[in-house]
């Protein structure tokens, strides 16, 4: 049986823990065929690990999209898009491609960096991506930006933000709480327009979690492509990334990536799902 084809529109992380490298590793683990349209290349200073983002020429980006669309993706995921032009184009490509699912990971900062890559990108995401997305996967910071509510510090804050984001056109909103809400448990909040669900796992080590957000969104995309409902895909992706985080490892003195193969190779983590 032919594999489902999944396109990631994302940046390249030279350390390979996040970005399109994380997406492709996740796609391989979850039995979908991964394709890439590269938006940028992220490199790191060897002394400080500060990030430098080099955009891909727009003509080259367009040629990548032409190739991918000609193949016919079943699902599309976005990661680091970088510019408002690319954000708009990503939304257009979903429509042009005829793909069944569109997962938006609204990347706004590089791991370890504090400043938004391009403040104007938030409004572009709201205008061009949220109305077309099947699922959007913001972390707390990104959800605060997309909703306009600012800093989110509780499940109730997350519910308010999820409702605002849902009202902007995305039918399935999953806000990743991570370690910000509790030191013992990891809480995410899922909203489908009818019911809020809290997704809970134990809190695992947080020193080596580079690429967790990309991996979660990529897993959601893969599960959707392979036939799971959005709710099922999100819960399964939470389990997949929890295993990856628990088995994260030290790469150097600055960073450690998640283990993208841990779910299949080592262990599968249980996710508790409760209505809230």
From Swiss-Prot:
Gene Ontology cellular-component terms for this entry are: cytosol
Q: Which residues bind Mg(2+)?
A: 142
* Keyword annotations from UniProtKB, A to Z: ATP-binding, Kinase, Magnesium, Metal-binding, Nucleotide-binding, Transferase
Q: Which GO terms describe its biological process?
A: thiamine biosynthetic process
Q: Name one GO molecular function term.
A: ATP binding
Protein origin, superkingdom: Bacteria
Main EC class of this protein? transferase
Q: Which Pfam families match?
A: Phos_pyr_kin (PF08543)
The UniProt entry, under CDD domains, shows: HMPP_kinase (cd01169)
Catalytic reaction(s) noted: pyridoxal + ATP = pyridoxal 5'-phosphate + ADP + H(+)
Detail which positions bind ATP.
139, 176-180, 188, 213, 238
Which EC numbers characterise this protein's activity in its record?
2.7.1.35
Tell me which family the UniProt entry assigns to this protein.
Belongs to the ThiD family.
Q: What does this protein do?
A: Phosphorylates B6 vitamers; functions in a salvage pathway. Uses pyridoxal, pyridoxine, and pyridoxamine as substrates.
**Protein name stated in the entry:** Putative pyridoxine kinase
From which source organism is this entry? Staphylococcus epidermidis (strain ATCC 12228 / FDA PCI 1200)
